Amino acid sequence: LPDVKYVKTGDGLVYEQVNQGAGQPAKAGDVAVFHWIIRRANGYFIYGSIDCGIGCGNGDPSEYRLGPDGNLIAGLDELLTGMRPGEKRRALVPPALGYVRKGMEPQPPEFGQKRQVEAHANEPLVFEVKLIKTRTKA
């Protein structure tokens, strides 16, 4: 088995670095362009921005501003901050760092998927993210 290293942050986010990226690390104020997959903690698939068939996006990445003035859930903001382009991380996001209020991003496009996110906002969610690039202007 591969030697997997998990990082646990002070506020309870646990993540695994799947691979290394290259270039400048993402920071608050940057617009992060990334792919994401969300699952329940039991592995049940909810949505993926990648083009993977039924229940997935069309392959277009998501774009959100990092930092406190953004609308990204805290766990994903923390996960993406410090990542380099090409890097992939898998994280267990606790409810306190997840969808703590309605309208937080990212949101799946379909009604049923949004209901899944809403219905399971009180449990840890698994996110896989791959940072494609960052830019400083929206």
Language model features: what each stretch is:
Residues 1-138:
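Cross-family detector of peptidyl-prolyl cis-trans isomerase
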